[in-house]
From Swiss-Prot:
UniProt-listed Enzyme Commission number(s): 7.1.1.-
Gene name for this UniProt entry: ndhB
Transmembrane segment boundaries: 18-38, 51-71, 87-107, 111-131, 134-154, 168-188, 211-231, 244-264, 278-298, 306-326, 337-357, 379-399, 411-431, 470-490
The name this protein goes by in its record: NAD(P)H-quinone oxidoreductase subunit 2, chloroplastic
Main localization, broad class: plastid
Cleavable signal peptide: none
Subunit structure: NDH is composed of at least 16 different subunits, 5 of which are encoded in the nucleus.
Amino acid sequence: MNDINLFLAKLTYTSAKLTILPEIILILGLVAVVVIDLLSKGKNTFLLYKISMVTLLASAVILLWQWGFFTAYERSHARDFGNIFRFFLLICSLLSISSSVDYILCSKMSLAEFLLFKLAAGLGGMVLSCANDLVTIYVSLEFLALSSCFLSGYTKRDMRSNEATMKFLLMSGASSSLLLYGFSLLYGLSGGQLQLDKIVDGIIFNRYGSIIYLSAAFTTAGTAFKLSLFPFHQWTPDVYEGSPTPVVAFFSVTSKVAALALFTRLFGLIFPYFSNEWHVAVGLLATFSMILGNLIAVTQRSVKRMLAFSSISQIGYIMIGVLSADSGNGYASMITYTFIYILMNLGTFACITLFGLRTGTDNIRDYAGLYMKDPVLTFSLVLCLLSLGGMPPLSGFFGKLYLFWHGWKAGLYSLVLVALVTSVISIYYYLKIIKLMFTGKSGRSDTPLNSRQNSLVSLSISISKNSLEIAMIICALASTLSGIFIDPIIEITRNTFF
């Protein structure tokens, strides 16, 4: 009996120390999806969906257990930061898969391929969030980017989707090239080091200061592409509009969260002694992102293009949290608002996915009179849009309040003032949709777009009758309730300064 207890204790300790166990579980899930799809010849779709959800849940549970173990025995701020973003990526994958199944079945596409690429993208993002060397960072970033690119072109017969894929692939390749060149400069300046902490030691007393600035510039440009920061945002509206809506929902949060973790780790660990210089540069990018994103979003007629420009402005707000980090609060304001943004954005995209399945359109004018047809969808979309706009008492308001207050304390007065003004502008185009849903007259019937979708409704019901509605309601409620429980969230995210 004592031997069994000793064995179990050793197994528990070994599992807790194996920090990549959540990623290993995801890899096993990937293999299981591929093997079962081959054996069943694509017929057992419910089992594939079930395996994906169980894999993500198991990975999240293991991650939380390991996090609690390390918190109790060996505290590490860098590990806390990585674990938070790994958990965020698992949440993104869970909610996006549950809100995508109906769409994929109605599109008559292979569910196995879709789940494979989503799990692969989540895996790449998780590895990227805690990577400590340049090689792992680059490989995991490309893994995430290629998986997202394949998802973007998932509907192969759609010309808009093919165009979006080509733009995404070209721009992603260009940004990766810039980032790789920045890494090569860091590698040379540090004397051939790959580990981030050793690179810092190698460049502190380096005499080639101008090359260090050049490396920081290329690194900023490469990560700004992934974040859709001005002026590296040009690909975002076209890719958002052309890609399938559930795919846009997925990489609008997944790629942003992973790239944000990368940006923060690189500049927080490698360039802390040049903070004045890169703070000015990133502050300018954030300012123009907030102004441009909100002003152009006002003029859009497509909901997906509007949300694309909205996401550009949102990442500008989040940059305030990155620039205002300190040893007392860490990156608490940035992480807190990122978590709230995930819920708001996924909830909004779940609503427009459901609307698109019924009408086949994403034109803002077609939302007229939606309240009379589907009150649940209408109120869910209202909650998510108002939260994105920062209206009280929703979570977006409390997230922005904490973010802007933290930025004001850090002396980022001009950035905070711009953020406040542009937040007011954003409320206008969100309220425009809300007003249309309640007061407009609809001329479009609330039925699926074509007979092919009609024939697949029964198949969709057998697999995931309410998965999209459930994901939509969960995100809508979370967009409200997470603001009420914001204090515990802030407390968890405080010890994250490198």
